[in-house]
Structures are given as structure tokens and as C-alpha cells.
Amino acid sequence: MNPRRKKRLTLAVALIGGVAAIASLLLYALNSNLNLFFTPTEIVQGKKDTGVMPEIGQRIRVGGMVTVGSMVRDPNSLHVEFAIHDAAGGEIIVTYDDLLPDLFREGQGIVAQGVLSAPGVLEATEVLAKHDENYMPPEVAEAMGQTHEKLDYNQEQKSGGY
């Protein structure tokens, strides 16, 4: 092989290696920042079609209804724990160490984002509450619509009482 061809081959191999390294770093960065959406039932039992369950330490988003009577506040800090459930009967515990949104209340739909710290326990970094009685996050509405009809709220829930 003459020196000119050897130089071209070395350059081509280096270029292909560089592109492969950049692509792998890009995919790694995207994968570590990816937040998959789950319902409480999917966290407990896995997704219906694939059986995929979130791993401990994985960043996820979970949506459902706050279980009435499940909220426990720590009087000495902002720490709060509550359960969320879906129509299929799945329920998980969410822990949160910050101020809850003003519209947050039991019996309402929420989406929580955070890290799965144990089976059935989400350490939330962000909690989003619905805006009014007609709004439901698209992911939650889709998940709830797959299992049963639209949820009806009683008068106490509509008025914002606990």
C-alpha cells in the first residue's frame, strides 16, 4: 500500500470512529434525560403491551388521581407523602419535599416527575396539578380513558373542599 492510500485509509477510519463516538455520546445523553410516562398500574405490573417496568433509580413521570385520605404532611418541614391511583386499581406512594401547587388536593388528577426510589415509591422533584375540573393532563386522560369512562366528581371535589 502506498503512503497516500495509507494516509486516506487512516483519515477515513478516524472520521468514522469520531462520528461513532459522537453518536454514542449523543444517544447516552438523550437516554439519561428521557422521562417515560407510566400509570400507577404500569409501575406495579408493567406496561400492558411490552411488560416493561421502570427500574429503581429511573427518572419517570407518573399520572393519576390523588387517593383521598392518603396525604401525610410532616409538621416540621415541607415533606409530604400521598398515594396516587388509577382506574385499573394500581396505587403508588409519592414523596415530595417542596411546596405543593395551589390547585393540589385529594381526589384530583396530577402528574408527578421524579425518581423511582423503591418498588411503588416515587421521589418527586416536580408535581403538576390540574387547572380546573375540566382539565386533565393528556397522558392521564389517555390512560384513564383506556380503562373506563370519564370520571365524575362529586360536589365537594368540584368546590375544592377536602
Curated annotation (Swiss-Prot):
Q: Which InterPro entries match?
A: CcmE (IPR004329), CcmE-like_sf (IPR036127), NA-bd_OB-fold (IPR012340)
Q: How does it sit in the membrane?
A: Single-pass type II membrane protein
Q: Which residues lie on this side of the membrane: Periplasmic?
A: 30-162
Compartments annotated for it: namely: Cell inner membrane
Which positions bind heme? 131, 135
Q: Which Pfam families match?
A: CcmE
Q: Report what the protein is called.
A: Cytochrome c-type biogenesis protein CcmE
Its principal location? membrane
Q: Which GO terms describe its biological process?
A: cytochrome complex assembly
Which source organism does the UniProt entry give?
A: Shewanella pealeana (strain ATCC 700345 / ANG-SQ1)
Transmembrane segments annotated in the record for this chain:
9-29
Question: What's its job?
Answer: Heme chaperone required for the biogenesis of c-type cytochromes. Transiently binds heme delivered by CcmC and transfers the heme to apo-cytochromes in a process facilitated by CcmF and CcmH.
Per the record, GO CC terms? plasma membrane
Keywords per UniProt:
Cell inner membrane, Cell membrane, Cytochrome c-type biogenesis, Heme, Iron, Membrane, Metal-binding, Signal-anchor, Transmembrane, Transmembrane helix
GO terms, molecular function? heme binding; metal ion binding
Please indicate the ranges of residues that lie on the Cytoplasmic side: 1-8
Of which family is this protein a member? Belongs to the CcmE/CycJ family.
Q: Which SUPFAM superfamilies match?
A: Heme chaperone CcmE
